[in-house]
Every structure is written in structure tokens, then in C-alpha cells.
Amino acid sequence: PFYCNYALTNYSDRKARAILDDVVHQILQTDLRTYDKTTGLWKHAWDETHSQFWANQGNGQSRHTWARALGWYVMAIMECLDVMPNDYPRKAELVALLQKTMQAVVQNQDKNSGVWYDVMDVKSPKNYLESTASCMFSYVLLKGSRQGWLSSDFREAGKRAYQGILQRFIRVNNDLTLSLTDCCSVSGLGPGKGPFVPKGKENYRRDGSFDYYMSEPIRDNDPKGIGPFIWASLEMEQYNAQ
């Protein structure tokens, strides 16, 4: 989104249009490289060389769909749409991609709670409902429908997610402040050996396995969840004011 905004603010129409084309290209390449036809979801990452220890040697994809990675992706698509001019001809390509991704997100929404599991393509008692990605998805569903890029059915899914967030993840503390619980603190992949990795800084624990994701700490009030929760709350406030 910053790349789009900077181009539109500082460059001529022709140069800004070329930068918007680059933004669309990058987003579509991410779809092409990380989409998994078997699950209908997007993998956490892709290695162009197919050589990293966490990557599938055939297609370069990591093993699983990490919910927050997909949350970052769909938020980026939507925020780029938000700043792209309506007469930009390739805007429709991103609208179609947003609809495709959010359809898959809704299909993987937990039926009981309305929120999402940390690793979206694994059904296991060890998996857990995770708040930061759930806030991201709720925000995109609510804002995307308000902006007309997603249908009203998606708004209903976003409202259900928001209620699930309030019920499952929001704790009222003794001093009457709020806490957002069940935040994945961090997850990543590697790095392994490489020309830009200092010797001794490799991290082979982060191998992209399900057990790896489950080994990362869970905390309260991670800013990567608080921000999207505030944004989703503002969307609900606008909806309720109608």
C-alpha cells in the first residue's frame, strides 16, 4: 500500500501507472507461487531456488498454510485496492483475487467459534484458535464488503468472526482494561545456509513442520493482532451506525 501511495503522490500518471502494474504483478506472482490446488489455500512461503531445507524440492513451497501469513496477504491486497484509482484498469484483477482468497478463508472458518486455527490446513487436537489472523480476516471481510469488493455474505462471515473474537479472545482485566489473548508470538522459516546468512545464524528449528508452528510461544496483546482488532472494531462501529 505504501508503494502505491508513494507513486500516486510523487510521480506522473505514466510512472505511477507503471508502479501500480508492478504492485499487481507482485501480488499475482505470490498467488501463482504459493497457491496449493490440493487444499485450496496459500502456503506460508515459497523458495525460488527450491533448495531451502523447509521448501518442497519440486515446487519450492513450504509445507503448511500459516493463518497470519495469509492474513498479511489479504490485508495487503485490500489496502492496495483502497488507494488505487477506480479508473486503473488492472484493479479488477485484484478484486477477483480478493474474492478468491476470502472465499477460501470463509470455507476454513471454524463453524463453532467463527474464528480460525493457527495452521489452516491441519486438523489436530494440538492446533489452536489464533487471534491475530482471526482479527485480520474479520477486518478484511468487513471492510471488503463495505467497499463493495466482497458481497454481503462475506460481511456476515466477518460479523460472525468479530463476535467470535470478542467471545474467545477478549479478556476484561481486573483494572477494566482489555487484553487480546491467544496471539501467536512469531513464526518463520529458516534461514538455512546461504550467501546472505552469517555463519552461525542458521535456524533449522524453523522447518515449516506442524510441530514447529505449535512450538512457538502464545502471548497476549501482540501488536500484530491489536492493530487489526482495532480496525475490525472500527468497521463494526461503522456498520452498526448505519
Whereabouts are the PLM-identified features?
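A structure-centric feature marking long, well-folded core domains of fungal metabolic enzymes
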Residues: R14, W54, Y73, Q99, ...
